[in-house]
């Protein structure tokens, strides 16, 4: 017999948003997903040589854990 209450809540109609605009509905464990990029605005698919200006991994980590980069 399977264990009860060990699985996350499943949302059948999860909204996928890009820049605040709804893109589609999917199934997920989150009620809403915010994405930065998708095929309609990705430089590879739009044939543009635009530099993607997004936070680097280190900066994102430091911001997430509220750390100061100048700390030694």
Curated annotation (Swiss-Prot):
Gene3D superfamilies: Ribosomal protein L31 (4.10.830.30)
Swiss-Prot/TrEMBL GO biological process terms: translation
InterPro entries for the chain: Ribosomal_bL28/bL31-like_sf (IPR034704), Ribosomal_bL31 (IPR002150), Ribosomal_bL31_sf (IPR042105)
GO cellular component: chloroplast; ribonucleoprotein complex; ribosome
Main location, first listed in the record: plastid
Subunit annotation: Part of the 50S ribosomal subunit.
Protein family: Belongs to the bacterial ribosomal protein bL31 family. Type A subfamily.
Name recorded for this polypeptide: Large ribosomal subunit protein bL31c
Gene: rpl31
């Amino acid at each position: 017999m399977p264990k009860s209450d060990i699985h996350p809540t499943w949302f059948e109609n999860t909204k996928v948003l890009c820049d605040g605009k709804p893109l589609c509905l999917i199934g997920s464990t989150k009620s809403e997903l915010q994405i930065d990029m998708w095929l309609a605005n990705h430089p590879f698919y739009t044939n543009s040589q635009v530099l993607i200006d997004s936070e680097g991994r280190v900066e994102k980590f430091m911001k997430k854990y509220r750390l100061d980069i100048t700390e030694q």
